[in-house]
């Protein structure tokens, strides 16, 4: 049997109006992956005589977006010769940051779209910092709107230099920079004849070369629980995605912070595992599974609990403990000071956390400390802080289990900051 093509999740990032949606639209249009409902609408309008025009499709997508129906560009799939690619999200969705962190899908790579007409803009920087903070290691740069600068190589080189400077400061190496026109279809799927000076890959060729994401099977087992069902004749069935490690029938698993909160181990032997209604003997990272655990009741566990092996249980941070984190403030109306208590979202959990200390303000580009013990931090700042959860929760240092160490901080219906756990300080 031929090995299945690797699945890769990508996000599109970049400044507003630089052409992210158009680029996604063009990728889907030229690979014949436009959502069914749009094609249907086209046919219903009796426009069979006209060629299926890109501009028309983009207008429909835009209309539906404005009516508040996101054509879920999110979770749109297409194939390249060597990859199955899922576009998991694009900013502009209000919950973009939260989705990137707590979403069922961690991005393997990002496409940074920069308009040749503008170059690097504030959001270009913010999204690039964010990609770094969220552990996206592979980036592809698309310099869009080349048609608006007459496909001029000099303009391309100038913008390319700006982007390279930004990304290299953030520690990115070896990334393709591709001149495209999403609107005209140059170098997205089809090679352009308008830029003979460019010898590199098209966008789809670059996507086809994204490294296969490694499966973290050597890390300790962690399964954040999304839901808990009670199934007649089976019993309690927690459902979640295996983030790290391997779960096998017969393993003994423990749930945290449930065990800490109930002051008794909520644990048992795994009797069965199912994925898409098929029984499995073992489940690997990325698998969305339901599993039945002997002796664990429906009221013992809930969304936000995490399953791990009893030999290496999930790390619990209690209200008497604290953790040190590096954050980037994305959107706060005034300033964050000690005592601020927003809600932290990580994997499937959400818990209010208190800012206990502001240890240092960092230069977001270099990571160097620019100020010790600042009085406050504001939008655009990167900082090292000490946080204390208001109730027990599972979170892991990002160096040990990166999948379980990233978080979003939300308040007033928006994402205020994104961050990662550096270390955990347990109270005696």
From Swiss-Prot:
GO terms for cellular component: cytoplasm. GTP binds at residues 14-21, 89-93, 144-147. This is Elongation factor 1-alpha. Keywords: Cytoplasm, Elongation factor, GTP-binding, Hydrolase, Magnesium, Metal-binding, Nucleotide-binding, Protein biosynthesis. It comes from the Archaea. It is an enzyme of class 3 (hydrolase). NCBIfam families: EF-1_alpha, PRK12317.1, small_GTP. It is found in: Cytoplasm. Mg(2+) binds at residue 21.
